[in-house]
Amino acid sequence: MILQPGAWAVADILYEGKAKIIYPTPDPAIVLAVFKDDATAFNAQKRGTISGKGAVNATVSAKLFLLLERSGVPTHYIDQPAANQLLFRRLKMIPLEVVVRNIVAGSLAKRTGLASGTVLGEAIVEFYYKNDALGDPLLNDEHILKVLTTVDALQLAELRRSALQVNAILSAFYRECGIRLVDFKLEYGYDGAGQLQLGDELSPDNCRLWTLEEDRILDKDRFRFDMGEVEGAYQEVLARVIAKAGP
């Protein structure tokens, strides 16, 4: 049985990040993630609160992890014991953020000079070093394989292959929801048996989501750039996902 985290001492917290608190459970191979309403942007230089965000992100993540599992993508998802809580398999995380881009937006627009909203001929995969102190810098394959030696060539190829598979599945699903999957960030790790699994979350916090009808933004960019109607956008994503995936 999983204890209610509210009854645990602070010392029981395994890790607290910007969006989630990770607690141990009686099973050392399983952790409990409590999703927070806290919001951050620009590497935590901007902070705030989005009411209901924790429950939205946990529920959307649960639906999408289940979709991916059914499609043959191993993930760390186990169950959703409460609206803002998910049970995950404990992973040894790879210190890379894997970003998949279908449409030019954000930093890609700044780096290339291409107009935001430009549709790419095919999805591209980028890798960033997961290090807040360094600002999560963009890496190329040479940096990863020869400097950081974070993963080997076969592992890097598997990360890229898996990310593109996830993109194909989620893009098709979101299209059915009337949403365009612009870009998104993934994190991976290895379970106790050494199997690569998709970790972290899949939510409006780490996915750029625009409506198909009018490219209306439904993600954290609304908070990031003070666009207003942030809570409504998150709730709309949740409603569209549940309408397609089921309660």
Curated annotation (Swiss-Prot):
Keywords, ordered alphabetically: ATP-binding, Ligase, Nucleotide-binding, Purine biosynthesis
EC number(s) reported in the record: 6.3.2.6
InterPro entries in the cross-refs: SAICAR_synt/ADE2_N (IPR028923), SAICAR_synt_PurC (IPR033934), SAICAR_synth (IPR001636), SAICAR_synthetase (IPR050089), SAICAR_synthetase_CS (IPR018236)
Gene3D superfamilies: ATP-grasp fold, B domain, Phosphorylase Kinase, domain 1
Gene Ontology process terms (BP): 'de novo' IMP biosynthetic process; cobalamin biosynthetic process
Pathway assignment: Purine metabolism; IMP biosynthesis via de novo pathway; 5-amino-1-(5-phospho-D-ribosyl)imidazole-4-carboxamide from 5-amino-1-(5-phospho-D-ribosyl)imidazole-4-carboxylate: step 1/2
Pfam families named in the record: SAICAR_synt
The protein's name in its UniProt record: Phosphoribosylaminoimidazole-succinocarboxamide synthase
Record organism: Gloeobacter violaceus (strain ATCC 29082 / PCC 7421)
